[in-house]
Amino acid sequence: MDKLILQDKYLMNFFTQRTDGLQYKEVKANTVSKNHFVVEDLKYFISETSLNKTAYRKLLKTFANNEKQLLEEFMEVLNKRIGESMNMALFINNNKSVTFKGVKINLFYPSGSITHGDALFEENQFSIVQELPYIYNYEGKKQFSFRPDITFFLNGIFLGYSELKSNYNNQSAHKNGKAKIANDYQKAAINYLEIAEGNDISQTIRKDFLKIFEKAIHITTTDVQDTFVIRNISSQFDEIKARVEDNSFDFDKYKA
């Protein structure tokens, strides 16, 4: 099956259109901020959903009704917390709500609430973006970029991504998909090592640069037959670093 048919006619249809599918919302790549937030989804969730409406109005007053400034500062706080978390699963589990400027804001509504049942869960905004560019700039220069096939968001917050492979081109998720993910990660890790040598003791740059890989709940690759889940890709980092330092890195091993 051709990759575009797999992506558009099957997966995107299942994610967004079918009544027995996931009922996600598709959003455009140009609505995603440089720090990987779907700004309108985040804004909607913290300002219009049941447990956030009143709190948001109160919060907005502290910003003299400057909504743009509020959102920018709020995303900065979230981005920092994400960087301090092991991954997005732990971030969401530990930050179902946050206190911002003294005001409690919910970030996610769990299902099965004793009081609300699943009603609040239904207010969560699950979104996907096709062909979303990830670009990392350092000191005004582009260091790394790639474009995952599908990227997933929850209430405007990045969750993970998926790479698709097509047997039409004699490719498979097992071989080419996993290799593509490993190749992208090793390229990013090597570029990070080049700019961070001696300058990233606190790993601030790493937390920002490699977050799309290392913070993802999971990275998946799929074809028409199989799906593979890659977790904890950061476990490869020390090996990549060691082999780069002693010039023994086998780049051919990671070719997609």
What is each model feature region?
Residues M1-A256:
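An alpha-helical interface "stripe"
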